Regions:
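C-terminal terminal-subdomain/extension
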Residues: 2-4, 79-135
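Short, charged beta-turn/beta-strand-edge "cap" motif at the junction between a beta-strand
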Residues: 27-31
Length: 135
């Protein structure tokens, strides 16, 4: 089956919400170096619902069930589809809605809070907020 046939045959995804976990696909040859190279993988939507409602692109963080023994600085634990895993927060990317294959679940509020904290660190937002005297 070609990717185009597979792409056309997938169920229609209607409304996408922050915190939802989707199976999505990427072209294997798009990745270089240490970027994720798998054709299909899981990811959690982290773009805001206001953006998700109107846009056809979503900000997503890939999830993995590999190497769970150690959680690195920009990773956090997850539990999706009855499987333990982790969010690879430093691998954040934007994907088109057409890449989404199926919804598998939703992260808990606690899991999303952990992701938000790591995002603040990755983008140095704590320093920005301190400079603006917002924290």
């Amino acid at each position: 089956m070609t990717l185009i046939k597979k792409f056309k045959a997938k169920p229609k995804i209607s409304e996408v919400k922050k915190g939802e976990v989707y199976r999505y696909w990427i072209w294997k040859h798009e990745a270089v170096g240490t970027e994720i190279k798998k054709k299909e993988r899981l990811g959690v939507i982290i773009s805001t619902n206001g953006l998700n409602k109107w846009d056809k692109r979503f900000v997503i963080i890939p999830l993995t069930s590999k190497k769970l023994g150690e959680i690195y600085r920009y990773e956090t634990r997850t539990f999706v589809d009855s499987k333990h895993g982790k969010a690879l927060i430093d691998q954040i990317k934007t994907v088109d809605k057409k890449r989404l294959i199926e919804k598998l679940g939703q992260l808990t509020e606690k899991e999303m809070d952990a992701i938000h904290e790591k995002l603040f660190s990755i983008f140095d937002l704590w320093e920005y907020l301190k400079k603006r005297e917002l924290v």
